[in-house]
Amino acid sequence: MFIVVEGGEGAGKTQFTQALSKRLMEEGKEVVLTREPGGSALGEQLRDLVLDVTQEISSYAELLLFLAARAQHIQEKILPALESGKTVICDRFHDSTIVYQGIAGGLGEAFVTDLCYRVVGDEPFLPDITFLLDLPEKEGLLRKTRQKNLDRFEQKPTSFHRAAREGFISLAERSPDRYKILDALLPTEVSVDQALLQIRALI
C-alpha cells in the first residue's frame, strides 16, 4: 500500500508519518518511511538545492527539480518497496507540487498536474490513499516561526500559504475516494487513530 501525507507548513506531517509508521509496524507491517523532495541520494541533493534560501531559482526550474527528484525516488525506492509487499508512507508527493508550484506558485494547476502524472510514464502513478493534515495557515506559520532556520517555502508570505491551503482542500474535495482530511489541530495520536481506521478499510 502506498500512503501519502500532505499539508501546509507546520501541519505536523513529519511527526504524523513517524507515528503512523510506528503503529503499522506494531501491527506487523513492513513499512518504508520516506519524503519528498528526497528519498534517494539524488533526491536529497536536489532537496538541499531547492530549499536553500540563498538560491534564486526560477519557477520552471524549481518545478523541474522537484520532478527530477520524484522520478528518481519512485524508480529507486517507492516501486521496489511496493513490489516487495511493503507499505510505503511518503511525506509529500504529487499534490504538494500541484499546489505549491501550480496553484499557489502560479504555473497553473492543469499544466503542473500533467507533468506530475507523466513523471514515470504515460500513466499517472498515484497513492492508494492520501491524508491531508489541515490547519489554518497562520497557525502553521506560527509553529514554524518557533524554528531558527526557515527554508525558501517557509519564508513565503501568508498569501502564498493561504492559497496553498485552499488548493489542498480543493484537491481533496474533488477526490474524496482517495483523500481523507484530518484536523491538524488535534493531537497526533488522535489523527493517527483516524488514519488507521481509513487504512484498515482499504485492506
Swiss-Prot record:
It catalyses: dTMP + ATP = dTDP + ADP. InterPro entries: P-loop_NTPase, Thymidylate_kin-like_dom, Thymidylate_kin_CS, Thymidylate_kinase. HAMAP family: Thymidylate_kinase. The keyword Kinase applies. It is an enzyme of class 2 (transferase). The gene is tmk. Phosphorylation of dTMP to form dTDP in both de novo and salvage pathways of dTTP synthesis. This is Thymidylate kinase. Its EC number is 2.7.4.9. It comes from Chlamydia muridarum (strain MoPn / Nigg). GO terms for biological process: dTDP biosynthetic process; dTTP biosynthetic process; dUDP biosynthetic process. One of its GO terms (cellular component) is cytosol. ATP binds at G7, G8, E9, G10, A11, G12, K13, T14. GO terms for molecular function: ATP binding; dTMP kinase activity. Belongs to the thymidylate kinase family. Pfam families: Thymidylate_kin. Keywords: ATP-binding, Kinase, Nucleotide biosynthesis, Nucleotide-binding, Transferase.
